[in-house]
């Protein structure tokens, strides 16, 4: 019985993964960084500026506590797994 209890405790601790923090790509360097405590959402924000036709959309990557508010003309994609927000490929 003690062995079963010990096994359940070990499995519970492994499943809880206490202290886990998300890693997201962050601009301007597009490097993977550990997000601060409480910020478990990765986001990719894209928008066009005056030079969008020649150089493509502007991109902002980062961590957030909640998915950022969507504004007109701005596309936001949010996700919650490690490095799920890579720099978008130009089309």
UniProtKB/Swiss-Prot annotation:
Disulfide bonds join 24-42, 35-63, 48-52, 67-78, 79-84. One of its GO terms (cellular component) is extracellular region. Residues 1-21 form the signal peptide. SUPFAM superfamilies: Snake toxin-like (SSF57302). Keywords: Acetylcholine receptor inhibiting toxin, Disulfide bond, Ion channel impairing toxin, Neurotoxin, Postsynaptic neurotoxin, Secreted, Signal, Toxin. GO terms for molecular function: acetylcholine receptor inhibitor activity; ion channel regulator activity; toxin activity. Expressed by the venom gland. The keyword Signal applies. Pfam families: Toxin_cobra-type. It is found in: Secreted. Binds with high affinity to muscular (alpha-1/CHRNA1) and neuronal (alpha-7/CHRNA7) nicotinic acetylcholine receptor (nAChR) and inhibits acetylcholine from binding to the receptor, thereby impairing neuromuscular and neuronal transmission. Belongs to the three-finger toxin family. Long-chain subfamily. Type II alpha-neurotoxin sub-subfamily. This is Long neurotoxin OH-56. It comes from Ophiophagus hannah.
